[in-house]
Amino acid sequence: MWSDPIADMLTRIRNANMVFKEYTDIPASNLKKKICEILKREGFIADYKYIEDGKQGILRVYLKYKGGRKNRERVIHGIVRVSHAGRRIYVDKDHIPKVKNGLGIAILTTSKGVLTDKEARQLGVGGEVIAYVW
């Protein structure tokens, strides 16, 4: 049985977002922390924090919504895992994808760390496409 911790993280965020949860808890790892940092910096989540539990730790991701209580609107409209264990997707610096014509982001792991598509283009590096968020 294969397990994909990044796909699990994205699914937890997607499911909590669909039912307007305030936050969701995710088993922590360094890669997941970096992905959360990008999501926060790009304005897709309100915040996240690391909670020590004596094991690997937990990331509590606080989701972000627009509008008031009655007419709330999701900030994350879609979040999709691109490269997975059965099919790795690598791109070079000239073929970094644009998500929704620049309205979304692609998250990449590169030799310079975890970056958005825009940052990777500026640094001139390619890498593995982890996810699309819009």
Swiss-Prot record:
Gene3D superfamilies the UniProt entry points to: 3.30.1370.30, 3.30.1490.10
Pfam families (UniProt xref): Ribosomal_S8 (PF00410)
A GO term for molecular function: rRNA binding
GO biological process, one term: translation
GO cellular component: a single term: cytosolic small ribosomal subunit
Classification via InterPro entries: Ribosomal_uS8 (IPR000630), Ribosomal_uS8_CS (IPR047863), Ribosomal_uS8_sf (IPR035987)
Keywords attached to this entry: Ribonucleoprotein, Ribosomal protein, RNA-binding, rRNA-binding
Superkingdom assignment: Bacteria
Protein function: One of the primary rRNA binding proteins, it binds directly to 16S rRNA central domain where it helps coordinate assembly of the platform of the 30S subunit.
Quaternary data: Part of the 30S ribosomal subunit. Contacts proteins S5 and S12.
Family per similarity comment: Belongs to the universal ribosomal protein uS8 family.
Protein name stated in the entry: Small ribosomal subunit protein uS8
